C-alpha cells in the first residue's frame, strides 16, 4: 500500500464507534518523505471540522514554534494524531479506539520512516515513548527506540492554558533543531 492508498483507506474507516460522530477523518498533513513526524493524541473540534491536524488557536501556536526552527507543515515535516477521529466532547480516546487506530499510525510510520518523532502532549508521549512518561519533567529529552529518536513536548493547547510553560516548549524546539542537524539528511535542504 502506498501513501495515497493508505490515506484513501483511512478516510473510510469504520473500525470503532468514533466514525459515527466524526465530520472528517484527520489523516494528517505534510511531506510523506519527512524525516520528522509530529504526533498528537487526537483531533479536536476544529480539526474534525476541517479534516486537518492542529488547526485553530493551538495549531497557530504550534506553527509559530515550527517556523522558529525552520519547519513547515507543507515542506519538511508530517503531522498527525494517534486517533484519527475526534472523540466526543474531546474526551480521552478509549482503549478500543486507540487499538482500532494504531494500525493506521503504524502504516504511516512504515511509509514515512521518520528519523525523529515528536509527541505533542502527555498522552501521545505515554502511548509512544513509555506509559509513565512525565511531559512536565522529561519534555525535550530524546529517547532512541529501534533507530528512531522520540521526544515528548508540551501540547500547544496546554501552553495556551498555561503560558508560563512557553519558554520550556520553545527550548524543546531548539533541541529538536539540534537533533535534526545531527541525525537527519534532508530536512533542512
Predicted regions and their residues:
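A polyanion-binding, active-site-adjacent surface
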Residues: 1-189
Amino acid at each position: 500500500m502506498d501513501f495515497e492508498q493508505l490515506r484513501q483507506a483511512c478516510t473510510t474507516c469504520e473500525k470503532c464507534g468514533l466514525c459515527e460522530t466524526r465530520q472528517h477523518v484527520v489523516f494528517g498533513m505534510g511531506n510523506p518523505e519527512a524525516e520528522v513526524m509530529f504526533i498528537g493524541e487526537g483531533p479536536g473540534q476544529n480539526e474534525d471540522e476541517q479534516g486537518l491536524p492542529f488547526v485553530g488557536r493551538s495549531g497557530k501556536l504550534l506553527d509559530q514554534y515550527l517556523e522558529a526552527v525552520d519547519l513547515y507543515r507543507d515542506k519538511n515535516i508530517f503531522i498527525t494524531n494517534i486517533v484519527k477521529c475526534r472523540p466526543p466532547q474531546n474526551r480521552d480516546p478509549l482503549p478500543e479506539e486507540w487499538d482500532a487506530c494504531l494500525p493506521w499510525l503504524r502504516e504511516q510510520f512504515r511509509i514515512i520512516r521518520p528519523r525523529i518523532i515528536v509527541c505533542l502532549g502527555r498522552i501521545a508521549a505515554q502511548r509512544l515513548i513509555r506509559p509513565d512518561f512525565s511531559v512536565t519533567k522529561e519534555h525535550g529529552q530524546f529517547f532512541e527506540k529501534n533507530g528512531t529518536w522520540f521526544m515528548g513536548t508540551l501540547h500547544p493547547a496546554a501552553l495556551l492554558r498555561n503560558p508560563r510553560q512557553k519558554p520550556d516548549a520553545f527550548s524543546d524546539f531548539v533541541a529538536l533543531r539540534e537533533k535534526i542537524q545531527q541525525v537527519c539528511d534532508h530536512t533542512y535542504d
